Amino acid sequence: MKGVLFIVASLVAFATGQDCPAYYVRSQSGQSCYRYFNMRVPYRMASEFCEMVTPCGNGPAKMGALASVSSPQENMEIYQLVAGFSQDNQMENEVWLGWNSMSPFFWEDGTPAYPNGFAAFSSSGMAPPRPGAPPSRAWPVNPQNPMSGPPGRAPVMKRQNPPVRPGQGGRQIPQGVGPQWEAVEVTAMRAFVCEVPAGRNVPIGQQPGMGQGFGNQQPGFGNQPGMGGRQPGFGNQPGMGGRQPGFGNQPGMGGRQPGFGNQPGVGGRQPGFGNQPGMGGRQPGFGNQPGVGGRQPGFGNQPGMGGQQPGVGGRQPGFGNQPGMGGNQPGMGGQQPGMGGRQPGVGGRQPGMGGQQPGMGGRQPGMGGQQPNNPNNPNNPNNPNNPNNPNPRFNRPRMLQEADALA
């Protein structure tokens, strides 16, 4: 159940740019937003659910809570909100209010409760009494003071049960009659009403936060801080294109201090992804010293891809010229021992595979060479086509001459 409540709270807390969260109703005073939840849960679960709701707009940085009642008008307003969901426009379900006997001097939102418990408010703020009834004595709360009751209780708001009148059957509450409260055990299952402070509709870009936004002068996504702003965050200090640490110039993309900027940054001048070090930079890293196309060790010239020292295509040991792919010294395709080099190695000119000296395919003794043990060498005395072959078994010309003589 808690997981379901959390998901619902996340959805209802979504700010739509209004002064109240989605599906909340702003109070007549303009200070609060209410929403009735027709889910029967214990008091503590209802309280935790309301605390997950965040305010909207430029309202106070205060989370939601179970509804607290600070005036007779607010008492009647909450009652009418809940009653509006009933078929007969009356309150069908009892709802939790944000107070409990374990902390009797404060409402759930932190505001003080009345010193004498839930004493009646002045009758000056009450709705007019029903026709024919005497003036209202005040806020219609049960005579029992909840503060004097046993612990582990919390008040619920419910409709009054007026005397049965002809034609009403006891089902209708006459206009002007408000709800009553009753303290029940906190483990009971009741519906509830959440309250969250109302925000103010402020044009985007004038206040802190998201607009107060792009290119503005207050913290958030604006200039202080914001994208293109001048203080820490996504702005200049720090921000994209800014001048202090972060994604700006100090540090930032194209900035002048460490980070993704010039010091360090893409194309920057100090360590990182910039020139010192960075892509295309001049010191160690991915830049010139070292880096792609750089001049010191790494992926640059010393050593690096296309560099002048060890690396791919370089002139010193490694995958470059000394030794390396296509290099001048030992390595793959180099001019010294290595694959295709000019000294011992695969395809070299000295001992090795395909070289010009002993080795596979070379020009000196070895496999495929032009020296002894090669049967195709005309100077090889073991070649059967050599007329100077002393062995008659393998000297074909002599064998043919002897055969003609015998014939």
Curated annotation (Swiss-Prot):
Residues 1-17 form the signal peptide. One of its GO terms (cellular component) is extracellular region. Keywords: Repeat, Secreted, Signal. PROSITE patterns: C_TYPE_LECTIN_2 (PS50041). Expressed specifically in the micromere/primary mesenchyme cells (PMC) lineage. InterPro entries: C-type_lectin-like, C-type_lectin-like/link_sf, CTDL_fold, Pericardin-like_rpt, SM50_spicule_matrix. SUPFAM superfamilies: C-type lectin-like. It is found in: Secreted. Residues 223-369 have a biased composition (Gly residues). Pfam families: Pericardin_rpt. SMART domains: CLECT. The keyword Phosphoprotein does not apply. PANTHER family: 50 KDA SPICULE MATRIX PROTEIN, 50 KDA SPICULE MATRIX PROTEIN-RELATED. The repetitive domain may provide a calcite binding matrix. Belongs to the SM50 family. Major matrix protein of the sea urchin embryo spicule which directs crystal growth in certain orientations and inhibit growth in others. This is 41 kDa spicule matrix protein. It comes from Hemicentrotus pulcherrimus (Sea urchin).
